[in-house]
């Protein structure tokens, strides 16, 4: 599965209501669908980096791109809700910033949620009901187009030997995978006191170690 791409923007494409980029990486052109607000800062020939969610089907695969891992992971949370497919998930992220979207779901703001293409009242209600508690563990800076998503209460984790950005990404990823707050905290403390502690800036190392602890036979 493709999770991340860095390459040269070759061209912009548009088909129906969908649009995106062809990105050249090591001699291969990848067609990636993005929300239009992600496209605006990118000029032709520019080097771009996108985080990828890949959807595999019998007739091929589709790539959905995001400017950072936080938005990609939020997209994955959205499409985990029954009836929310990739196109609707992308439409939700198109309609407002990630921070505003999280706020709307937590507040049950149906008016804002239904502004997204393909989202009716029932779908908006389902989003609010199923994700309110899950997203309530995240904080988002209001009205930020570059949202900073993090778990609200992490005061007890400040002493861990991991830098703030990897810590934030680790919490978000584990939450996206369905782990509860308490499980995440226990895993991170266990990794921090283990025999082989990952480097403070090694987010992937912390993730692998946390998942090993969470999936240990006695867990």
Curated annotation (Swiss-Prot):
The RuvA-RuvB-RuvC complex processes Holliday junction (HJ) DNA during genetic recombination and DNA repair, while the RuvA-RuvB complex plays an important role in the rescue of blocked DNA replication forks via replication fork reversal (RFR). RuvA specifically binds to HJ cruciform DNA, conferring on it an open structure. The RuvB hexamer acts as an ATP-dependent pump, pulling dsDNA into and through the RuvAB complex. HJ branch migration allows RuvC to scan DNA until it finds its consensus sequence, where it cleaves and resolves the cruciform DNA. Has three domains with a flexible linker between the domains II and III and assumes an 'L' shape. Domain III is highly mobile and contacts RuvB. Residues 1-67 are annotated as: Domain I. The keyword DNA damage applies. Belongs to the RuvA family. Its main location: cytoplasm. GO terms for cellular component: cytoplasm; Holliday junction helicase complex; Holliday junction resolvase complex. Homotetramer. Forms an RuvA(8)-RuvB(12)-Holliday junction (HJ) complex. HJ DNA is sandwiched between 2 RuvA tetramers; dsDNA enters through RuvA and exits via RuvB. An RuvB hexamer assembles on each DNA strand where it exits the tetramer. Each RuvB hexamer is contacted by two RuvA subunits (via domain III) on 2 adjacent RuvB subunits; this complex drives branch migration. In the full resolvosome a probable DNA-RuvA(4)-RuvB(12)-RuvC(2) complex forms which resolves the HJ. Residues 147-161 are annotated as: Flexible linker. It comes from Synechococcus sp. (strain CC9311). SMART domains: HhH1 (SM00278). Keywords: Cytoplasm, DNA damage, DNA recombination, DNA repair, DNA-binding. NCBIfam families: ruvA (TIGR00084). GO terms for biological process: DNA recombination; DNA repair. This is Holliday junction branch migration complex subunit RuvA. Residues 162-219 are annotated as: Domain III. Residues 68-146 are annotated as: Domain II. It is found in: Cytoplasm. One of its GO terms (molecular function) is four-way junction DNA binding.
């Amino acid at each position: 599965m493709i999770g991340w791409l860095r390459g040269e923007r070759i061209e912009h494409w548009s088909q129906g209501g969908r649009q995106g980029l062809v990105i050249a990486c090591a001699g291969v052109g990848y067609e990636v669908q993005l929300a239009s607000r992600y496209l605006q800062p990118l000029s032709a020939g520019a080097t771009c980096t996108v985080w990828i969610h890949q959807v595999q089907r019998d007739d091929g695969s589709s790539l959905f791109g995001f400017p950072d891992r936080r938005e990609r992971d939020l997209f994955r949370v959205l499409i985990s809700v029954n009836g929310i497919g990739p196109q609707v998930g992308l439409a939700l992220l198109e309609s407002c910033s990630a921070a505003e979207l999280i706020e709307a779901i937590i507040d049950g703001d149906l008016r804002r949620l239904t502004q997204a293409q393909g989202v009716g009242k029932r779908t908006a209600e389902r989003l609010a009901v199923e994700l309110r508690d899950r997203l309530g563990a995240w904080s988002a800076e209001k009205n930020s187009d570059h949202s900073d998503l993090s778990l609200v209460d992490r005061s007890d984790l400040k002493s861990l030997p991991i830098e703030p950005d990897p810590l934030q990404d680790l919490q978000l990823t584990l939450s996206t995978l369905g782990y509860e707050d308490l499980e995440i905290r226990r895993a991170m403390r266990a990794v921090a006191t283990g025999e082989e502690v990952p480097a403070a800036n090694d987010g992937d190392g912390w993730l692998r170690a946390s998942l090993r602890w969470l999936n240990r036979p006695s867990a």
